[in-house]
A protein has these predicted regions:
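Class I S-adenosyl-L-methionine
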Residues: 1-172
Length: 172
């Protein structure tokens, strides 16, 4: 697949300023767990960064996120993502972040991410998530994908049952 054709399918990647590589973002409004937590004071999603600022100031950002979400339905999405990630522009950075905004939508989406990772073995993929059901599928996770469970509440202890976690704390 040509890169230009792959880009038509996946829509675009983002390049978060504070990250060393490219990312693929979806609309935070469609997060399954985060969409509920955004209404809960004390949760890490309360006041979600991806639901304000540039994400709302520039309508084309939100529009692109929804196009990316819709692109997941394409039977060519896995091949297209792998083509773009394997391109020199993206692969030279050696790391890729899934969901600088948004989260895994369902098992089909997770399976597609697994397939993309298998097709891009030279890349270290990083995927933060609040979708705890993914734990049931960690045994199938490719070695080059680090799935980090983000705790749902501020000052919540890390989940000991996950190999990689992240927390938000008010002190320390």
């Amino acid at each position: 697949m040509l890169i230009k054709d792959a880009n038509k399918i996946i829509v675009s990647l983002s390049k978060p300023e504070k990250m060393p590589g490219f990312a693929y973002g979806l609309p935070a409004w469609e997060c399954k767990t985060g969409g509920k937590l955004v209404k809960v004071p004390g949760s890490v999603c309360f006041g979600c960064y991806a639901m304000k600022g540039n994400y709302t100031r520039f309508p084309e950002i939100r529009k692109s996120q929804y196009k990316r979400l819709d692109s997941l339905k394409s039977p060519l999405w896995v091949e297209a993502m792998a083509t773009v990630i394997n391109s020199e522009r993206v692969s030279k950075l050696k790391v890729f972040r899934w969901h600088d905004a948004g989260d895994v939508q369902d098992l089909d989406h997770l399976n597609k991410i697994f397939e993309v990772c298998k097709l891009t073995p030279q890349i270290t993929h990083w995927m933060p998530t609040r979708e705890a059901w993914i734990k049931d599928h960690l045994n199938r996770c490719p070695d080059n994908l680090i799935i980090r469970l983000s705790m749902t509440m501020i000052d919540q202890p890390a989940a000991g049952s996950w190999p990689n976690t992240s927390t938000v704390v008010t002190t320390g």
